[in-house]
């Protein structure tokens, strides 16, 4: 599911891992993750990276996996084509303009990745790879007429043609590739699918995102093995009732279309676990959808619901729920039945009172309430003992809500106020959030920070941009894990003298501050220049202190009175004080008689 946001906002990266991203949400796909891990293990276990062209002795007849990606290759090296036992070949992200005839030697190759190269034509010999199961030609400016070669690859199970400029799919591909299970066609210019697509009876996944479909391709509804359909970012106005025939469908992505309603028959897709309806024009859901009891992820953001659909509260298996920008004013009492929720996005709504129903969701780990009208938090928020990320940016909080300090698992807090009320202080009790790693408190009216920040050992990111800070507490130098300190647009004129002790600090921003120490020209040179300036300052100060102590000792030993008296006398223009014998002390060395 895709959500965007400006500024610091609390949103989800991948569902089950439950980590935050800014500003985009991505799907969590355990299958893809497993494939990635498997690929990496193979890479580590069997062969160093391919080229290896410089060390050809490392390539042997028994080599079956090779990675030549990101090498700047313009052709496929003959050394690779000579490896007849190769099963998996990665040549993506190069500058390869043509496939040589020798490609036909790779008769045992099952996986061939050539995406993001400069291929236009495909040589006929490519069609001779009789063992090939997975082919990726994405991101190449392919000539459509050359794709007929692909139809000869009868063993193909996965074919990816993303971003290849396709305006149509060659019918030969759909007629001949009867074993195809995954068909990737996203980011092209397709308006329809050939009717021969019905021959793909083994197809499990089809990706058609970012094309020009105005009508749902109904032929998909007879492909009964389909588990994943991705039609995000098209121009669909409706979904046919025949969608109910896809009883094995598990993931259905139709975000960013022009849908106004859903068919009742969608309820027959009883295995559906992910339903993304984000950014459509849906006002209500058919009551029959309450039968979709296996749903774990639902996206309704960007629709004008105004109320939480009653049936939604029956989806008790939900882990992730996106209700961003849906014109909500509150939640139903039955919302507390969603006890398995881990992520809840209620941002950009019209919520004035924190929904207490949320406090019953004890498994909740991420809560986004950004850009609402919430004024205070209830004490019962302490029941959210597993909450790790809380987004409250852009609300009408009258003061920093101390109820937050009861959230013992909190790791990231977003409470910047780019709109709504501004906070004037950050309580010393912030130290109670011992697990806090990131604190975003930008766009407020803070004039100072609490010294207790130095007692937060896990703090890594502190965003205080656009406040009224005049100085930083010296204690901040003890937050040894701090990686980012964002201070631009404040009233700072100096930095703590030991700030360079923050050895993990990689990002320090000081723009739009009236800096004097270090001066602006030093600040503009970056961290190293700032650290050097602070160290030199300490050395100068230490030397001045040493000289002062030495001179004070001399004055006292010579009997000229205390150092302070001497300073006072000089400031008033008087003569130096007399020594103990009543004689006036000389300006230079003391007389021998005065020596003790």
UniProtKB/Swiss-Prot annotation:
Residues 569-587 have a biased composition (Basic residues). CDD domains: IQCG (cd23766). This is Leucine-rich repeat and IQ domain-containing protein 4. Residues 569-596 are annotated as: Disordered. Residues 540-569 form the IQ domain. Pfam families: IQ, LRR_1, LRR_14, LRR_8. The keyword Repeat applies. LRR repeats lie at residues 22-44, 59-83, 84-106, 108-129, 130-152, 153-176, 177-200, 202-223, 224-246, 248-269, 270-293, 295-315, 317-337, 338-361, 362-384, 385-407, 410-433, 434-457, 459-479, 480-502, 504-525, 527-549.
């Amino acid at each position: 599911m895709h959500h965007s946001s400006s500024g610091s906002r609390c949103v989800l990266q991948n569902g089950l891992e439950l980590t935050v991203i800014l500003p985009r949400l991505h799907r969590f796909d355990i299958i893809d993750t497993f494939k990635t891990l498997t690929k990496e293990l193979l890479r580590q276990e069997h062969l160093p990276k391919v080229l290896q062209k410089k060390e050809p002795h490392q390539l042997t007849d028994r080599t079956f996996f090779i990675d030549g990606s990101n090498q700047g290759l313009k052709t496929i090296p003959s050394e690779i084509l000579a490896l007849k036992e190769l099963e998996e070949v990665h040549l993506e992200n190069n500058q390869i303009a043509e496939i040589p005839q020798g490609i036909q030697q790779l008769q045992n190759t099952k996986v061939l990745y050539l995406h993001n190269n400069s291929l236009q034509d495909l040589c006929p010999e490519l069609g001779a790879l009789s063992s090939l199961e997975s082919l990726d030609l994405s991101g190449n400016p392919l000539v459509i007429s050359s794709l007929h070669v692909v139809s000869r690859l009868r063993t193909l199970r996965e074919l990816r043609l993303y971003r290849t400029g396709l305006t149509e799919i060659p019918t030969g591909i759909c007629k001949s590739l009867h074993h195809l299970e995954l068909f990737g066609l996203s980011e092209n210019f397709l308006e329809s699918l050939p009717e021969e697509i019905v021959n793909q009876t083994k197809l499990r996944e089809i990706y058609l995102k970012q094309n020009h479909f105005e009508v749902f391709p109904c032929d998909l509804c007879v492909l009964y093995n389909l588990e994943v359909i991705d039609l995000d970012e098209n121009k669909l106005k409706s979904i046919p009732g025949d969608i109910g025939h896809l009883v094995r469908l598990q993931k259905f992505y139709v975000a960013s279309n022009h849908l106004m309603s859903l068919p009742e028959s969608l309820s027959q897709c009883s295995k559906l676990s992910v339903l993304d309806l984000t950014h459509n024009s849906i006002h209500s859901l058919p009551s029959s959808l309450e039968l979709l009891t296996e749903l774990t992820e639902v996206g309704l953001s960007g629709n004008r619901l105004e109320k939480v659909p009653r049936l939604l509260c029956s989806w008790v298996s939900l882990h992730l729920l996106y209700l961003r920008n849906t014109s909500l004013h509150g939640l139903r009492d039955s919302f507390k039945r969603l006890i398995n929720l881990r992520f809840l996005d209620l941002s950009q709504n019209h919520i004035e009172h924190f929904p207490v129903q949320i406090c019953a969701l004890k498994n909740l780990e991420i809560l986004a309430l950004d850009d609402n009208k919430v004024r205070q938090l209830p004490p019962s928020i302490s029941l959210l003992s597993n909450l790790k990320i809380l987004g409250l940016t852009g609300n009408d909080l009258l003061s920093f809500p101390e109820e937050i300090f009861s959230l013992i698992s909190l790791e990231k807090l977003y409470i910047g106020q780019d709109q709504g009320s501004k906070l004037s202080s950050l309580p010393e009790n912030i130290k109670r959030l011992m697990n806090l790693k990131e604190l975003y408190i930008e766009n407020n009216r803070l004039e100072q920070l609490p010294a207790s920040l130095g007692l937060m050992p896990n703090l890594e990111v502190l965003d205080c941009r656009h406040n009224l800070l005049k100085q930083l507490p010296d204690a901040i130098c003890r937050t040894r894990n701090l990686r980012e300190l964002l201070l631009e647009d404040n009233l700072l004129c100096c930095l703590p003298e030991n700030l360079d002790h923050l050895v993990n600090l990689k990002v320090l921003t000081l723009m739009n501050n009236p800096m004097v120490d270090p001066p602006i020209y030093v600040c503009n040179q970056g961290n190293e220049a700032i650290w050097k300036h602070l160290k030199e300052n300490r050395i100068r100060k230490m030397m001045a202190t040493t000289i002062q102590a030495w001179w004070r000792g001399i004055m006292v030993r010579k009997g000229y009175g205390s150092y302070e008296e001497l300073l006072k006398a000089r400031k008033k223009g008087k003569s130096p004080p007399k020594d103990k014998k009543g004689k006036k002390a000389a300006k230079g060395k003391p007389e021998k008689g005065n020596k003790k």
